[in-house]
């Protein structure tokens, strides 16, 4: 179990600058969620530049990066959101963490425990936050379940098997349909 410690980083009286690495379905959800809070992504980078430009235009993103290296080199970037395919995560994590950027990475954060240990170590070495985008921890049902487990309502637990599903609007463009 990875514990994420809070690391404070001074951002001079401004909102943190987020960059999305990837601009697929889940990155669109992040951009929409930020819009609802009156915020915008600072930048976007994608392996297909045309998609990055379209994403930036759609969400009013200030900067389109042409490479991930450029993202890491930009001192204005505070947090990188990684929503690329799973097998690419460690590649981007290594670069972002070594550059001193905070990272929120989609699940699964890495392909194996060795990659995860490496990423955690890099985050510690560079004093930045590394987090996996696990939303279930914040859902009311899981908070209630944890409360009941801690209170011993289920007796001594040896094994827990859980399934989770959520309703999604039908969308033929979504790979899950």
Regions flagged by a language model, labelled:
Residues 136-177:
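Predominantly a Rossmann-like dinucleotide-binding segment in NAD(P)-dependent oxidoreductases
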Residues 30, 62-120:
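Beta-loop-alpha module in the N-terminal Rossmann-like domain of NAD(P)-dependent dehydrogenases
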Residues 20, 65, 105, 130-132, ...:
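Hydrophobic residues in well-ordered beta-strands that form the structural core
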Residues 55-61, 122-125:
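Short, conserved SAM-binding/catalytic segment
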């Amino acid at each position: 179990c990875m514990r994420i410690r809070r690391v404070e980083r001074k951002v001079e009286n401004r909102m943190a600058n987020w960059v999305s690495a990837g601009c697929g379905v889940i990155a669109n959800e992040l951009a929409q969620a930020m819009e609802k809070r009156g915020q915008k992504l600072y930048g976007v980078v994608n392996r297909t530049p045309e998609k990055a430009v379209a994403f930036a235009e759609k969400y009013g993103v200030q900067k389109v990066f042409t490479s991930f290296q450029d993202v890491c080199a930009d001192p204005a970037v505070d947090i990188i959101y990684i929503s690329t395919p799973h097998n690419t995560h460690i590649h981007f994590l290594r670069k972002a963490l070594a550059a001193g950027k905070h990272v929120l990475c989609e699940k699964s954060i890495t392909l194996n425990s060795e990659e995860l240990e490496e990423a955690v170590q890099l985050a510690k070495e560079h004093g930045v936050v590394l987090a996996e985008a696990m939303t279930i921890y914040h859902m009311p049902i899981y908070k209630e379940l944890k409360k009941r487990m801690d209170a011993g309502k289920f007796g001594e637990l040896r094994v827990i098997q859980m399934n989770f599903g959520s309703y999604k609007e039908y969308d033929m463009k979504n790979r899950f349909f």
